[in-house]
């Protein structure tokens, strides 16, 4: 008997590849414009997670049980090669380990050739020049594989690890086709988070600078009225999060959304997240709502890009195609054996769950880490908020990125980190996907993600575009199985963290026990009183009597 998730997965395929208007009933779905991934980053946690033991703040906070990815049954196991490797994290021996299996899925692997140019891919000179001005001289594997086929009019599924240039792989052919027939709305790009939507918008504007492209950003956290006006003016490209665009489709008139019925090209960026089904917080209903107003698949070109190719995504290539339409082109580059960049050094650091903050403080101050730009990932927004308060009180230059922050503050905080005004960014998984933050030298997993693919997205914030990077995971006594699952997924083991001349435990005992203990109490008091990072009371908050 097929599983519930596999049945839902087949419906997903129908929405994207066959007939968008034939949707399943969604009368009970009430999505606000903020129903995007960045509003759903409280990862599903079991009661045994070290996250629940880390600090008193988290143990008192409300717990949301949300999943970031589908948990497959045995029949639904993704066709992704896994390699069993010996873990160097101390643990009890386990009999059941994953066997290494190499699964051939017939995907097209674009060869790497340092001599290939964009001009050789039939990219127009104005685009070649624009890319050159952005220091993009030669195509990456995913770009070399996908751009020529998209220009031929083929639907495309592109899978490649983080930092491999997937945005350019779809932006360049879209802009070249648009320049030949510049009407609006020519293309729609759907992506899970506001920050990623903004980044894609900026890249479209930069690449199209020689032309008069009109692009519009449609995301939550902003007034809907100016967005509706912008849509009514028929821009050339719309970059949107599914929740907010679905709100416009439900509430706006035909004069606002009518131009979407003529869209020539649609992109699902981070398609694995957009098409994930069977979990609370799924974006699939909103994605279906957005697709329902577009031309049917036979009359549009559909492009799916992701760093993790899930069964829902891969199944699309096997759907019946319209007579006369070219078959779906599938290009997977570095999605299996090289899911983690070879220039990334993965390490683990075993810490007691009762003193993780103490170890984090001293770890950030070691001689090698002090000059680095650092992203710290937490599983929950409450933990991220708490660490931001604590690290500021400990005189670290820190800022935050999570779903509880207002949109304007999220943009400002990300800008501060990119401009090096803040050395440390404390974030939830809202920052794990797609964001290109230059020169991140170190990623810290303060909490271990339950899904190994989320780990891949997190550590992909460093070691981008061939640069070197480090990722250190703080491991508690209950995290060992999670680490082993990650090692099996990426096919590489984590080394124990070490730095010459540094005994972290000794430094914690000598220098941080009293100080961090005091600052922890101050941080929790600030949060209890509703104060922002920096001590200012939030608007609308009254002083506690």
Curated annotation (Swiss-Prot):
Which example biological process does GO assign this protein?
rRNA processing
Coiled-coil regions listed: none
Q: Where is the Helicase ATP-binding domain?
A: 147-327
Tell whether Repressor is among the UniProt keywords: no
Stretches of Acidic residues bias are at 33-56
Give GO cellular component annotations, separated by semicolons. Answer: cytosol; nucleolus
The catalytic activity, as recorded, is:
ATP + H2O = ADP + phosphate + H(+)
Q: Name one GO molecular function term.
A: RNA binding
Localization (cell): Nucleus, Nucleolus
Checking Pfam families in the record gives: DEAD, Helicase_C
> What are the alphabetically sorted keywords of the record?
ATP-binding, Helicase, Hydrolase, Nucleotide-binding, Nucleus, Ribosome biogenesis, RNA-binding, rRNA processing
Annotated motif DEAD box, positions: 269-272
Its Enzyme Commission number(s) read 3.6.4.13
The record's listing under SUPFAM superfamilies reads: P-loop containing nucleoside triphosphate hydrolases
Please list which residues make up the signal peptide. Answer: none
Motif mapping: Q motif: 116-144
Residue ranges of domain Helicase C-terminal in the record:
359-510
Q: Where does ATP bind?
A: 160-167
Entry similarity comment = Belongs to the DEAD box helicase family. DDX49/DBP8 subfamily.
Q: What does this protein do?
A: ATP-binding RNA helicase involved in 40S ribosomal subunit biogenesis and is required for the normal formation of 18S rRNAs through pre-rRNA processing at A0, A1 and A2 sites. Required for vegetative growth.
Which named protein is this? ATP-dependent RNA helicase dbp8
Q: Which organism is it from?
A: Botryotinia fuckeliana (strain B05.10) (Noble rot fungus)
Q: Which gene encodes it?
A: dbp8
């Amino acid at each position: 008997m097929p599983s519930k998730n596999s049945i839902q997965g087949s419906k997903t395929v129908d929405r994207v590849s066959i007939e968008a208007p034939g949707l399943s009933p969604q009368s009970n779905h009430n999505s606000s414009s903020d129903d995007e991934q960045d509003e759903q980053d409280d990862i599903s946690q079991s009661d045994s997670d070290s996250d629940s033991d880390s600090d008193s703040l988290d143990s008192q906070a409300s717990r949301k049980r949300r999943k970031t990815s589908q948990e497959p049954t045995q029949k639904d196991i993704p066709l992704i090669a896994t390699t069993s490797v010996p873990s160097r994290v101390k643990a009890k021996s386990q009999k059941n380990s994953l066997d290494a299996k190499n699964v051939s899925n017939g995907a097209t692997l674009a060869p790497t050739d340092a001599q290939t140019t964009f001009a050789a891919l039939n990219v127009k000179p104005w685009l070649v020049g624009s890319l050159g001005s952005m220091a993009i001289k030669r195509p990456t594997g995913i770009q070399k594989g996908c751009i020529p086929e998209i220009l031929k009019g083929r639907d495309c599924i592109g899978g490649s690890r983080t930092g491999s240039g997937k945005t350019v792989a779809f932006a360049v052919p879209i802009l070249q086709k648009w320049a030949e027939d510049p009407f609006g709305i020519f293309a729609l790009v759907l992506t899970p988070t506001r920050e990623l939507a903004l980044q894609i918008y900026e890249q479209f504007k930069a690449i199209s600078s020689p032309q008069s492209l009109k692009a519009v950003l449609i995301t939550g956290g902003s007034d809907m009225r100016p967005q509706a006006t912008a849509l009514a003016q028929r821009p050339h490209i719309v970059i949107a999060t599914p929740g907010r665009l679905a709100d416009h489709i439900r509430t706006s008139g035909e004069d606002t959304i009518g131009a979407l019925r003529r869209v020539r090209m649609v992109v699902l960026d981070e398609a694995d997240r957009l098409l994930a089904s069977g979990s609370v917080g799924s974006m699939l209903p909103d994605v279906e709502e957005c697709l329902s107003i577009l031309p049917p698949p036979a009359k549009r070109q559909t492009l799916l890009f992701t760093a993790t190719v899930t069964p829902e995504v891969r199944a699309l290539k096997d759907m019946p195609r319209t007579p006369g339409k070219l078959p779906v082109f599938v290009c997977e580059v570095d999605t299996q054996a090289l899911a983690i960049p070879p220039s990334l050094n993965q390490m683990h650091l075993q810490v007691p769950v009762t003193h993780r903050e103490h170890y984090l403080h001293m770890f950030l101050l070691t001689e090698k880490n002090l000059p680095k730009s650092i992203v710290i990932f937490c599983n929950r927004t409450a933990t991220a908020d708490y660490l931001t308060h604590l690290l500021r009180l400990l005189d670290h230059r820190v800022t935050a990125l999570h779903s509880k922050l207002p949109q304007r503050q999220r943009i400002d905080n990300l800008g501060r980190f990119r401009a090096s005004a803040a050395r440390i960014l404390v974030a939830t998984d809202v920052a794990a996907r797609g964001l290109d933050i230059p020169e991140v030298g170190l990623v810290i997993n303060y909490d271990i993600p339950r899904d190994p693919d989320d780990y891949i997205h997190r550590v992909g914030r460093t070691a981008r575009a061939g640069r070197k990077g480090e990722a250190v995971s703080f491991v508690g006594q209950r995290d060992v199985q999670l680490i082993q699952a990650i090692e099996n997924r990426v096919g590489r083991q984590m080394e124990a963290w070490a730095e010459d001349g540094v005994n972290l435990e000794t430094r914690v005992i000598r220098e941080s026990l009293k100080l961090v203990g005091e600052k922890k109490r101050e941080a929790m008091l600030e949060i209890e009183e509703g104060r922002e990072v920096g001590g200012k009371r939030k608007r609308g908050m009254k002083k506690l009597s």
